[in-house]
């Protein structure tokens, strides 16, 4: 029996066995994109987060709605790379206190139901806690959710934050000539999949 047949059989068995109100665990795949956008007195700048991990518990109902029970996403500070080069990278690590707090962490604080998981999803407010540089603050992100093939769930959205709210001093470079503004926007696109399906897909 080839992997495609195994994958189909697993998906059908899962659908029949669970129905509504069955919680499933998901893991974050490597198909993600997380960027940090900001501006300065000289020009706009962008940073890419290279290492992101996460897990989620959700209920996919027969009517197409999704109940989000828990989400945890972790971003490695030292994997952040700037389009302004290594000097800006090091300034970012210092500003985020990477030695003491190596990860940026988001956790869902309020479970919610997503009634529209369609080809054209509308953004919904998702409440969570953002832990950054040793400070934890509540956030409300606008998130779109899309159900993909092979049991994947895609989440796409953004969050605007002010660095000084997290006791982070905006980084500067070029001997202080370039000074970053305190407001930044975190954009993200993440895919979650059930661990067993992830294993089958890797073996195809």
Language model features with spans:
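Bacterial N-terminal signal peptides that target proteins for export
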Residues: 1-7
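Bacterial N-terminal signal peptides
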Residues: 7-15
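Low-complexity, acidic/polar, glycine-enriched regions of mature
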Residues: 20-204
């Amino acid at each position: 029996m080839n992997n495609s047949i195994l994958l189909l059989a697993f998906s059908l068995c899962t659908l029949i066995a669970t129905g509504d109100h069955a919680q499933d665990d998901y893991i974050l795949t490597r198909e993600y994109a997380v960027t940090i956008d900001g501006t300065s007195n000289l020009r706009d700048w962008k940073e890419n987060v290279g290492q992101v991990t996460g897990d989620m518990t959700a209920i996919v109902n027969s009517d197409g709605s999704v109940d989000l029970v828990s989400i945890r996403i972790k971003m490695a500070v030292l994997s952040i790379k700037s389009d302004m080069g290594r000097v800006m990278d090091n300034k970012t690590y210092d500003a985020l206190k990477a030695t003491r707090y190596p990860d940026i962490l988001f956790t869902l604080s309020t479970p919610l139901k997503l009634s529209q998981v369609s080809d054209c999803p509308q953004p919904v407010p998702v409440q969570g806690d953002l832990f950054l540089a040793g400070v934890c603050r509540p956030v409300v992100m606008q998130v779109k959710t899309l159900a993909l093939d092979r049991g994947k769930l895609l989440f796409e959205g953004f969050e605007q934050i002010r660095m000084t709210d997290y006791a982070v001093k905006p980084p500067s470079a070029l001997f202080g000539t370039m000074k970053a503004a305190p407001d930044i926007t975190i954009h993200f696109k993440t895919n979650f999949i059930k661990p067993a399906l992830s294993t089958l897909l890797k073996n195809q």
